[in-house]
């Protein structure tokens, strides 16, 4: 039954001409494996782009996804607690996640002292929502460890960019 479901999903992506894929990077690697095992050659799929998040992933995983699915793979970031379609996403330069500063004020703090760290240093990501009504978040601790850069991106955007998630300050695992 599972093999049949995989074939149906792959067939639907093929038949509807899906050009984009949004999921976790680990699920995208699983999809790549099933597509390569299917009777439909990868060249017949129209996939061109993937937006991946909800779990940490590496540059090696990005390269593997881009090679195995013949797509451009972009990192996205969001939090259930913050709501909305996310907090930021990578641009075509793939050099950090642009955070939407018109809606969120990001900070990096030392997880032990909660004091701000210098730009570029790794610490815990903290958000204050600027436009969320009803339940605004003030200095919400994400427990995600990363860094921020305020340098202008090669794409021309000036929004702060977040580096990859490097770990958690609370060592929490979701199983």
Give the residues covered by each predicted segment.
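Active-site glycine/GP-rich loop and adjacent strand/helix microenvironment
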Residues: 9-175
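Short, small-residue-biased leader/transition segments that mark boundaries at the very start
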Residues: 1-8
């Amino acid at each position: 039954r599972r093999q049949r479901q995989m074939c149906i999903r792959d067939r639907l992506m093929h038949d509807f001409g899906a050009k984009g894929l949004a999921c976790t990077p680990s699920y995208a690697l699983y999809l790549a494996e099933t597509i390569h095992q299917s009777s439909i050659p990868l060249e017949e799929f129209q996939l061109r782009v993937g937006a991946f998040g909800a779990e940490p992933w590496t540059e090696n995983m990005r390269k593997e996804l881009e090679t195995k699915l013949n797509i451009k793979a972009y990192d996205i970031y969001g939090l259930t607690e913050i709501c909305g379609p996310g907090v930021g996403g990578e641009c075509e330069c793939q050099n950090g996640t642009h955070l939407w500063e018109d809606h969120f004020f990001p900070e990096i703090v030392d997880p032990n002292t909660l004091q701000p760290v210098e730009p570029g240093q790794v610490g815990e990501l903290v958000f204050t929502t600027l436009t969320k009504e009803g339940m605004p978040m003030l200095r919400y601790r994400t427990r995600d460890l990363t860094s921020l850069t305020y340098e202008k991106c090669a794409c021309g955007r000036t929004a702060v960019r977040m580096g990859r998630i490097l770990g958690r300050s609370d060592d929490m695992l979701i199983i």
